[in-house]
Amino acid sequence: MSALTKASGALKSVDYEVFGRVQGVCFRMYTEEEARKLGVVGWVKNTRQGTVTGQVQGPEDKVNAMKSWLSKVGSPSSRIDRTNFSNEKEISKLDFSGFSTRY
């Protein structure tokens, strides 16, 4: 275990999908910015169904903070109706080196 893992607790990974008015409102840009502020890694992208989906990885407390942001805050012009989280699990190492927007 690295010192980071010990200091911050277990590493977590979670997939998410955000429903509501989340496309055309800079949601991905703000998600990327918030992830960088919190220090989590992963990705975000728009779906054909009008939702935003992605994955977040990092220390459990920071992943939980990002989950809260994805559920309640979002971008200033967005309207979040609901956010679904799935595949939440403990991981031994991060799969990403940063947070990016996928197309």
UniProtKB/Swiss-Prot annotation:
Reported EC number(s) for this entry are 3.6.1.7
Keyword Disulfide bond included in the entry's annotation: yes
Instruction: Spell out the protein name for this chain.
Output: Acylphosphatase-2
Residues modified as N-acetylserine: 2
Recall the GO molecular function terms of this protein's record: acylphosphatase activity
Q: Where is the Acylphosphatase-like domain?
A: 13-103
List the catalysed reactions.
an acyl phosphate + H2O = a carboxylate + phosphate + H(+)
Its assembly, as annotated, is: Monomer (TU1) or homodimer (TU3) in absence of reducing factors; disulfide linked.
Q: Which UniProt keywords apply?
A: Acetylation, Disulfide bond, Glutathionylation, Hydrolase
State the encoding gene.
ACYP2
* Origin organism lineage: Eukaryota, Metazoa, Chordata, Craniata, Vertebrata
Record carries keyword Acetylation: yes
Q: Where is the active site?
A: 28, 46
- Database matches in Pfam families: Acylphosphatase (PF00708)
